[in-house]
């Protein structure tokens, strides 16, 4: 779904083409943290500085106001990705358990008739669990989904930088959701995919390979943030970490080591 603020969001998030091949190389000191589903996750020696990996990008619609609908074709994503009867892992239910019946948005909500879709990161100051605005909107906020093993080193609310290595586009991001252990490493929101120039359809979009993720552990406050805050914090953290040159070197070095 393209929001009316899509053009502005693209301008805010896209820092332009990054010429990785032309960047001067740094010596990259790194530590292998783990490997999951074929993706090796690395850290710089002081892991508070950065965790990075190269992977694919699957599209997550969770938190978007029109993510899921009782009539499956009307939702941004297939209802099967929100769960099934007795196990609704991505929807608010009447008993606030996965076993309950999904709650529909009302007339005063952003998308009446659509289900209330959740994210692992949410606004705790809003005590109304049935309010769709409590969660991180995938259509508006550039967020990444962390694999459970990554959450051993980083936490929800931390900032990140994500790069499309094929076209050089980069985007700031926040960690706002958690994947299941059996799912591949590498998932992001609709808004983040748009900023990277990737097909953002949760049903048919995404990208196989050539996406670099850099997460800054301990950088967030465990709360959702506005786009402007995400951009400003991630930009400063990326520059402090070493920027394009260091990421280029670390990706090349990690690729060589992973193939040994």
Regions found by a protein language model. Give the residues of each.
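Positively charged n-region of N-terminal signal peptides that target proteins for export
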Residues: 1-6
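Hydrophobic h-region of N-terminal signal peptides that target proteins for export
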Residues: 11-20
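Cell wall/extracellular polymer interaction/catalysis modules
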Residues: 20-169, 195-200, 216-255
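Soluble periplasmic/extracytoplasmic beta-strand elements of cell-envelope proteins
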Residues: 143, 174, 212-214
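Loop/turn elements at helix/coil->beta-strand transitions in domains of secreted/extracellular proteins
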Residues: 166-172, 209-210
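Short beta-strand-centered aromatic/proline hotspots
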Residues: 171-180
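Short, solvent-exposed secondary-structure boundary/capping segments
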Residues: 181-192
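Intrinsically disordered, low-complexity linker and terminal regions at domain boundaries
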Residues: 204-208
């Amino acid at each position: 779904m393209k929001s009316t603020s899509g053009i502005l969001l693209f301008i805010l998030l896209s820092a332009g083409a990054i010429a990785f091949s032309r960047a001067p190389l740094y010596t990259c000191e790194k530590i292998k943290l783990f490997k999951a589903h074929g993706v090796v996750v690395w850290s710089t020696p002081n892991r508070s500085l950065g965790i990075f990996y190269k992977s694919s990008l699957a599209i997550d619609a969770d938190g978007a106001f029109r993510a899921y609908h009782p009539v499956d074709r009307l939702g941004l994503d297939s209802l099967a990705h929100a769960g099934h009867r007795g196990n609704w892992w991505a929807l608010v239910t009447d008993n606030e358990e996965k076993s309950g019946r999904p709650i529909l948005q009302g007339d005063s909500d952003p998308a009446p008739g659509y289900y209330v879709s959740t994210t692992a990161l949410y606004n705790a100051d809003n005590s109304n669990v049935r309010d769709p605005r409590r969660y991180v909107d995938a259509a508006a906020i550039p967020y990444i989904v962390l694999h459970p093993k990554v959450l051993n080193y980083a936490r929800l609310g931390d900032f990140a930088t994500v790069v499309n290595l094929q076209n050089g586009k980069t985007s700031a991001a926040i960690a706002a959701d958690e994947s299941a252990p059996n799912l591949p490493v590498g998932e992001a929101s609709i808004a983040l995919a748009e900023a990277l120039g990737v097909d953002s359809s949760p049903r048919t979009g995404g990208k196989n390979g050539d996406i670099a993720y850099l997460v800054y552990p301990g950088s967030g406050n465990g709360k959702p943030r506005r786009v402007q805050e995400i951009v400003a914090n991630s930009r400063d953290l990326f520059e402090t970490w070493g920027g394009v040159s260091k990421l280029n070197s670390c990706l090349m070095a990690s690729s060589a080591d992973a193939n040994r």
